[in-house]
Amino acid sequence: MIGYAVLGGFVLDAIFGDPAWLPHPVVYMGKAISVLEKGLRARLPKTPEGELWGGRILALCLPVGTFALTSLVCMGAAALHPLLGLAVQMFWCGQALAAKGLVQESMNVYRELIKPDLPAARTAVSRIVGRDTQALTAEGVTKAAVETVAENASDGVIAPLLYMLLGGAPLALTYKAINTMDSMVGYKNTQYLYFGRAAAKLDDIANFLPSRIAALLWVAAAALTGNDARSAWRIWRRDRRNHASPNSAQTESACAGALNVQLAGPAYYFGEYYKKPTIGDAVRPIEPEDIRRADRMMYVESLLALALGLLMRGIL
């Protein structure tokens, strides 16, 4: 049943994406994280050790609770009727994927860039990146959008797809809980240096294998879409560690190589300047059309991952 749920979820995401009117599990995960963080901080000592333990408790409770709750709902639905169980799994699998939403948001940036309306492009890209965007040039906006497509191809598409192929919607949503937790508390700043450490480490572990699979699939997608697959492979091998996270540069490096552009580098986050290494070679200047090229490669690698997964499941 899992294979059919994954296939159905993939189709649902490709057609509908994430409609704004439809409640999304990630929203409730975010609310749960905020409540748990507030409660843990209030009850534990305000010391590095106390914050470490608070973060560990959060990193245990949220994924375990997510898996338990979603498993109970799926089993309950299947007990009422197998088709209802399949429908619930299919619906949640679709919500765990973010391919359509990623393309929609990145294309919003693309459309503003080609008008050209730089202030509107900055606003559009600010919805999908964490860096400060107020002073970005058109090149900086384009680079930010391409980087986001490449990175989220892993943690927004390939990783949840892999986990749902292994354990259905419950495991995919558990992964989303880990990823959401990291995005909310996994910062190395004063507020979360200790409290967010366990969440960040758990996210690194959960993404370790998927990010590398995603990078290899990106190289294959580069070949299938007429981009530079040889350069994608070479730059991935060279620059895949050019990031503080062991996973974030995996698909970014493959994407930079495929497009023959340079990504990453210094950026401002929350008003603070961060000096980060570059990824890829500036063989040519980056251009708005690279956003569309990245989107196409992301979709092709998603289809490759789906096909391989369904073959392993015996569906194809």
Regions found by a protein language model. Name each.
Residues M1-T174, I178, G186-L316:
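Hydrophobic alpha-helical transmembrane segments
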Residues S183:
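Glycine-rich phosphate/dinucleotide-binding loop and adjoining beta-alpha-beta core of small-molecule
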